[in-house]
Amino acid sequence: MIKTRGLITKVQPYKDNHLMINIYSQDYGKKSLIVFGGKSKKKRSSMIVGSINNFEFSTKDNVCKLSEVQLSHNWFLYNKHQLKLIDYACYMIDRLLFIEDNNSLVIDAYEELVNNLNDKKDYMISFFILELNILKSSGYEPNLSYSIISKILPIEKYKDQDLTVLFNLLDQNKEF
C-alpha cells in the first residue's frame, strides 16, 4: 500500500455505493481511485472536491483507503464566488496536471489560497500564484519578463523573475 497526501479534484459516483475520485499529489501525480462504500448512507463521506487528505492506495487495483481526513476549510463561510474559485482551481489541476513533480508548489499554493479564504484575507494574489504554479508544473513556462509585460502595462523596470511588482499592482487594484 502506498501512502500519500493529496488534493481531491473530482468525485463521481461509481456503481451502487462506491465513488471514483481523482486526486493529485506531488509524489504520484494524478490518480483515479475507487472508494468502496464512499456513498454509504450509514457513514458520512468526507470525499469533498477541494479537500486535502492523506490517502492509502494499492497500485494494482487503484482501491483507496482514506486514512486521515484534514478538512482545512470552512465551506459554509464562503460565498458563491469563492466556492467557484475553489471548483475552478480543482478543475484546472485535474485537467492540466497528470505527472508527479516533487518540485511543484501547486499543493502549497492551493493551501495558501484556502488559508487566505478562511482568514478572510485578499485571496486573488494567492489565486494568481496558484495559476502560475499550475502552468509551470504542466510544462508551460509563462514568460513574464519585463520586455513582454512592459508592452501591456506601464510599469517600471524590474528583474525578470521578480514578480512582486506585478503582484503589488494587483494588490493596489490599479486599472490600466
Question: Which positions does each model-derived feature cover?
Answer:
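Non-catalytic alpha-helical scaffolds and adjoining flexible linkers that form interface surfaces
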Residues: 1-19, 24-176
